[in-house]
């Protein structure tokens, strides 16, 4: 294997980090809430946190971006860094044909081409805001080990190579300028090489990069070993945590989200991270959110995320789902197609009716531009949300989410899929916090005339107060209605109904 040479950089020693207030850092939200009481790194202490702050339950929508050196290939998926080393895969053959043999042209060689020359941070932040998101940010580090911030801990970072920009810091500042909050997602738990000693499992799933002595993925030299994970576990686990601490200190993210395989990190380090993050926030009067998948963290500490899916019923706990705009990869690939905006909006409504929050994913190109097809979906969603904002933001799920005829398939990662084909006969509900307003969503254009709302019948979950009026939201058109021991219906007009999703407001005394 040839020696790895990275002529663009001089790498310093990996010793600590600078703890400073950055341009992307957030001001204290509630100075009066600052306290000296500290969380300790054990679940009994950490479970005292309010894992679902009011602002998060109110927000309903966040947006993040899968973007990194893997988008240079624009082939396969964001798992290209792994699959290009899996013999027999289409990515393996594509890489050899397009870039060269893996022994001569490794994943690290793609990084200089990740230049982000069209990355406009203000355009990104504005797009997220226009889509209706209340928080946004980057995939700070995917499974590939490349940090999308200016790091003193990780030598493979966007500040020193590739874009040579502090992507996370710039986004944090641009979002907060718009009164939006920041998410940083981390997928690096599987970056450690755990299979080097087991030839039969060099392609094992517990490590991202397949091990092979002829490839850079086996390098134990600096700095390559930190990218490919060839570091003793006793060094790597602190490295995993130190990167999180650095991001917390520099950017003060409001949400830190973890992908699966977090369970492979020893409990001690997960607890130490949680304690550090929660104490850091508490000292600044902030309420933050930790999100996880499967059973990787206790529900009393962290919000559960269901990938590309949703709940089948109302959840007592606030939950999260991460959903792609694309029909293929999370990252940009050539030939990518996208979901219909109506599909995205209707599935979003289903999520919030069941006490959930949606994290939408966008897939920028390697140059930093967001394809117009993705922008179209986001802007259509934003226009719909702007029209019906009061039925969405700050509302809560009812005891019964709704009813309808749409058939939901089981999701790959639990619950149901995020691509259910709803229609105007499918109904969902939200309500105001004071329970003085119920919002009725028809997931498509409903038929005009009498619409029975069986979920609001006297024997189910009727309105809690006398009804004052019923209106077609967005048109302020009063509707005929009846809610009593015998009837529970509204009368929909022939005009003013929304093709995407029609919303009716039931106001109470």
Predicted regions: what they are:
Residues 1-27:
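Bacterial Sec-dependent N-terminal signal peptides
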Residues 24-509:
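Mature catalytic domains of secreted/periplasmic carbohydrate-active enzymes
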């Amino acid at each position: 294997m040839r020696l790895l040479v990275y002529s663009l950089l001089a790498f310093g020693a990996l010793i600590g980090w600078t703890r400073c207030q950055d341009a992307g850092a957030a001001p204290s939200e509630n100075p009066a809430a600052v306290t000296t009481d500290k969380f300790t790194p054990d679940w009994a202490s950490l479970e005292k946190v309010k894992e679902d702050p009011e602002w998060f339950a109110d927000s309903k929508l966040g947006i993040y971006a899968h973007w990194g050196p893997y988008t240079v290939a624009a082939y396969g998926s964001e798992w290209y860094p792994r699959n290009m080393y899996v013999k027999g895969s289409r990515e393996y053959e594509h890489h050899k044909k397009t870039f060269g043999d893996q022994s001569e042209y490794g994943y690290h060689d793609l990084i200089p081409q990740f230049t982000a020359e069209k990355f406009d941070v203000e355009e990104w932040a504005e797009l997220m805001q226009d889509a209706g998101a209340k928080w946004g940010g980057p995939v700070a580090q995917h499974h590939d080990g490349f940090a999308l911030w200016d790091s003193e801990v990780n030598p493979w970072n966007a500040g020193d190579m590739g874009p040579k920009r502090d992507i996370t810091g710039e986004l944090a500042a641009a979002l907060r300028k718009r009164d939006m909050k920041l998410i940083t997602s981390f997928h690096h738990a599987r970056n450690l090489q755990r299979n080097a000693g087991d030839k039969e499992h060099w392609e094992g799933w517990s490590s991202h990069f397949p091990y092979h002595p002829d490839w850079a993925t086996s390098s134990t030299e600096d700095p390559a070993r930190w990218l490919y994970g060839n570091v003793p576990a006793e060094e790597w686990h602190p490295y995993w945590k130190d990167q999180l601490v650095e991001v917390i200190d520099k950017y003060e993210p409001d949400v830190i989200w973890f992908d699966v395989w977090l369970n492979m990190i020893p409990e001690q380090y997960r607890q130490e991270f949680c304690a550090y993050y929660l104490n850091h926030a508490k000292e600044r009067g902030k309420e933050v959110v930790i999100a996880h998948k499967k059973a990787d963290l206790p529900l009393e500490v962290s919000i559960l995320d269901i990938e590309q899916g949703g709940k089948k019923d109302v959840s007592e706990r606030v939950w999260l789902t991460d959903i792609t705009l694309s029909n293929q990869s999370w990252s940009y690939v050539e030939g990518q197609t996208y979901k219909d905006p109506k599909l995205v909006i209707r599935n979003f409504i289903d999520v919030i009716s069941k006490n959930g929050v949606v994290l939408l994913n966008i897939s920028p190109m390697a140059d930093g531009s967001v394809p117009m097809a993705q922008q179209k979906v986001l802007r259509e969603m934003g226009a719909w949300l702007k029209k019906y904002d009061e039925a969405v933001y700050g509302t809560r799920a009812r005891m019964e989410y709704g009813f309808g005829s749409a058939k939901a398939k089981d999701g790959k990662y639990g619950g149901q899929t995020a691509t259910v084909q709803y229609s105007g006969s499918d109904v969902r509900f939200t309500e105001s916090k004071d329970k003085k307003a119920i919002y009725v969503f028809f997931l498509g254009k409903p038929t005009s005339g009498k619409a029975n709302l069986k979920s609001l019948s006297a024997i189910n979950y009727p309105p809690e107060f006398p009804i004052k009026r019923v209106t077609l939201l967005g048109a302020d058109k009063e509707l005929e209605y009846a809610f009593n021991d015998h009837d529970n219906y509204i009368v929909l007009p022939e005009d003013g109904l929304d093709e995407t999703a029609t919303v009716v407001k039931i106001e109470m005394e």
